[in-house]
């Protein structure tokens, strides 16, 4: 790509005319802002070097963790005999932070940054959990199951703090979702400690609470989305990861609490699954996020499979299910923008103003791919 100064020098040297230079500038500016429907772009890989660095970082972190575990075993710092050592995860977390200082802060590499963030927060979580478990003792854990919930909550709280520190230093979009997941784990851990692990209704209570947390995460994601309705900044990437977290937290409890996840779906239950999936599809179109559809895909595949089986297509039920769902999703993908316009435009203006803009412009840099 030629710079502005090089174009001016070419005009001064008589290589091209001033009119041609102006036309070239206008053409490039036009290419940088082409009106296309958003395709939920997010930056993950800019080249094979991202994959190369990610593989190398994973190998290094595995080695560091293995060495930490070996040192812990030699020093007798393990949970039970040959159990996990609290020396391994802090070594992984510290190494992840050190690597992020270069590959995230300086090189701005997307995929390695995501991996290093997850290993850092995971390392802090494991360090706190293993340390508290060792301090309490395995006997106390075995005789008082509520302590386990408290340890989970405390560990997740420290992990949430670590995610906040990482966000303050590196601003990796997925960090906010990692922090939200940690806060959710704190809430669930405290719930288990209060209700008691031996309660017969604990599973349903957790599922209901998880649904509430999922809705809260979804609303948090919508707040980030609402602050960047044109999806031009990092805030949109933050919202993407939050939606990816919220989707299974919403979908799994709904289908499980309705009894649609027990392997014995009836015809009516299968129809309920399909209707719920359609409702999720309308919501996904309205907010312009595909995560809800992906999270519920396994449930609707199972439901359609059961419907085809009950209608007598036993041998072809799997193939017919894949054919119907695959065709429907491809059709939706091809006409996503048109379908979204049909759903969003009739909405009240107050609600429409909170959703991503329908006809927005996605900027495309002239020298590199968008994302």
Task: Locate predicted features.
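Alpha-helical multi-pass membrane segments and their bilayer interfacial helix-loop junctions
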Residues: 1-371
